[in-house]
Regions:
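Histidine/cysteine-enriched polar flanking segments
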Residues: 1-131
Length: 131
């Protein structure tokens, strides 16, 4: 996450420093700078919107967008970063009001980490269990 598009933002200095530190310590890696959206709720409270809250799913990148001018920039950046993936923009402007976004609502469970007994219960449709 970068904030190049919002130099007056309170997060600008910290994100700029992070980008510079990454360039210094990881020069062999390409950085892709996503813009910083600015979204507030009905009371004017800033919401934690970020284009970096994306999710990779097989050959697709599910990219949160927020009905902001920066959406198009974020899509272009992600197409550059993932040229062999389909970029699927997902409107998260309502979801971010719950203080999370696309990646936040997903649950990644690594293969072979759940107990067989738990999986058996889930296959039967049981979603609440105690063990």
């Amino acid at each position: 996450q970068a904030a190049f598009n919002r130099p007056q933002d309170s997060h600008y200095a910290g994100l700029k420093a992070l980008c510079e530190e990454c360039e210094q310590y990881l020069p062999q890696h390409t950085q892709y700078h996503l813009p910083l959206p600015y979204i507030v709720d009905e009371d004017g409270v800033r919401l934690p919107a970020s284009y970096a809250n994306f999710l990779i799913c097989n050959d697709a990148v599910l990219l949160p967008i927020y009905k902001q001018d920066e959406d198009a920039i974020a899509i272009d950046v992600m197409q550059s970063a993932y040229p062999n993936h389909v970029i699927e923009p997902i409107d998260c402007s309502v979801l971010v009001k719950q203080y999370g976004s696309l990646h936040c609502i997903s649950m990644q469970v690594p293969t072979n980490t759940l107990q067989a007994s738990v999986l058996a219960l889930l296959e039967k449709g049981v979603s609440i269990y105690a063990q």
